[in-house]
């Protein structure tokens, strides 16, 4: 979207009777030339508000950027993340060395993945590489996967071997364990205790017509499938969508409708609900309670189509549209950027401005 459009009007989207989404002239990140794949949110400089790391490049080398929140939800100051240009698909903010501040992990396409450690003030210094030069990393997922109190990383490598990198207790990822098949076309991994045994499990979204899997911790050998067995999935998130106490799986698909697979006490995911367009081009999906009514809602980012969010009342999903008509949204992230307790949406748009949609009270 051109900057002139931002300067001439504020586009408001009806979220519910008492909420709106609002685009502000200052609520954009990067340039309209960046090939942004995703964003991540967290308080990097310890000032109490959420900052944003933007993952740029995809297959082409660009610099990743860190945008610092001014306390009001605007991002006028930014720095490069490292000196290099990289082919980055994903960044994550997480405290990997248990020192109380957020560090940054970077997942790259056919370049080794990177770790940047934080000095507590938002100064991010390259620490070490992990992974392989030839890996097509598309997703990173962090959780304590072996129960030692430190954050590990599961890496989704499209058309290659997926790996878990275990934290050595000092924020280093040298110990690698492969899991799954040698040629899984994994794009995204979500971590959750799907079977309630106290260990984290890994939920995969695979493309290229491959089955989607759940790998059960702590060994990550036992697995089950969910979905049709031949989906073109791009993203996955996990939450209790119907309030029955069981975790459900929400998956984004290309060329088909997006799906919710409801968990049962038996550990199966046979009951499902389709939502979205029959020929969806959804690349990103994220769950959050947008209207703070106690139910988990869904935000989807589409390529070449308008984006949507779905408000959940446990019986049905109410669909709303937002974003550009022909934008290429590769990522959506959700968090309270302006400190009003309502979650805002950040869209990562390849070849366009990255846009913040503020969740506001109507005037």
Which sequence ranges carry the predicted segments?
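Short glycine/acidic-enriched loop and turn motifs that connect beta-strands
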Residues: 57-61, 111-112, 160-161, 208-210, ...
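Hydrophobic beta-strand segments that make up the repeating blades of beta-propeller
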Residues: 52-57, 104-108, 153-156, 202-206, ...
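Beta-strand-rich domains and repeat architectures in extracellular enzymes and scaffolds
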Residues: 29-57
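Beta-propeller blade termini
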Residues: 37-46, 89-98, 117, 138-147, ...
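Hydrophobic h-region of N-terminal signal peptides that target proteins for export
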Residues: 8-16
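Blade-edge motifs of beta-propeller repeat domains
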Residues: 17-34, 68-86, 117-135, 166-184, ...
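Blade-level signature of beta-propeller repeat domains, shared across WD40, Kelch, NHL, RCC1
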Residues: 330-363
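Solenoidal tandem-repeat scaffolds enriched in leucines and small polar residues
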Residues: 135-143, 147-163, 183-209, 213, ...
């Amino acid at each position: 979207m051109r900057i002139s459009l931002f300067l001439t009007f504020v586009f408001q989207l009806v979220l519910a009777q008492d909420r709106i989404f609002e685009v502000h002239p200052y609520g954009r990140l990067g340039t309209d030339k960046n090939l942004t794949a995703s964003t991540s949110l967290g308080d990097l400089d310890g000032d109490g508000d959420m900052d944003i790391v933007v993952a740029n490049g995809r297959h082409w080398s660009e610099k990743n950027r860190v945008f610092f929140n001014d306390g009001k939800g605007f991002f006028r100051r930014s720095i490069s993340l490292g000196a290099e240009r990289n082919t980055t698909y994903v960044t994550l903010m997480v405290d990997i060395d248990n020192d109380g501040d957020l560090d940054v992990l970077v997942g790259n396409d056919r370049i080794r993945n990177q770790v940047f450690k934080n000095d507590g003030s938002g100064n991010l210094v390259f620490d070490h590489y992990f992974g392989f030069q030839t890996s097509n990393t598309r997703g990173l997922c962090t959780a304590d996967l072996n129960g030692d109190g430190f954050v590990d990383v599961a890496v989704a490598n499209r058309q290659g071997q997926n790996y878990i990198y275990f934290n050595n207790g000092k924020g280093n990822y040298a110990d690698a364990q492969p899991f799954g098949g040698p040629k899984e076309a994994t794009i995204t991994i979500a971590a959750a205790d799907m079977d309630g045994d106290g260990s984290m499990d890994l939920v995969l979204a695979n493309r290229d017509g491959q089955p989607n899997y759940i790998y059960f911790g702590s060994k990550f050998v036992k697995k089950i499938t969910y979905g049709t067995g031949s989906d073109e999935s791009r993203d996955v998130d996990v939450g209790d969508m119907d309030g029955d106490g069981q975790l459900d799986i929400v998956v984004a698909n290309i060329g088909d409708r997006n799906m919710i697979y409801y968990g049962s006490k038996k550990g199966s995911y046979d009951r499902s609900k389709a939502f979205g367009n029959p020929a969806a081009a959804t690349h990103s999906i994220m769950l959050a309670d947008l209207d703070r009514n106690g139910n988990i809602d869904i935000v989807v980012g589409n390529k070449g189509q308008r984006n949507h969010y779905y408000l959940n009342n446990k019986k049905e999903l109410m669909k709303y549209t937002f974003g550009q008509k022909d934008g290429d949204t590769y990522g959506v992230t959700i968090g309270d950027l302006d400190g009003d307790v309502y979650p805002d949406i950040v869209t990562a748009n390849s070849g366009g401005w990255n846009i913040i949609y503020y969740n506001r009270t109507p005037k």
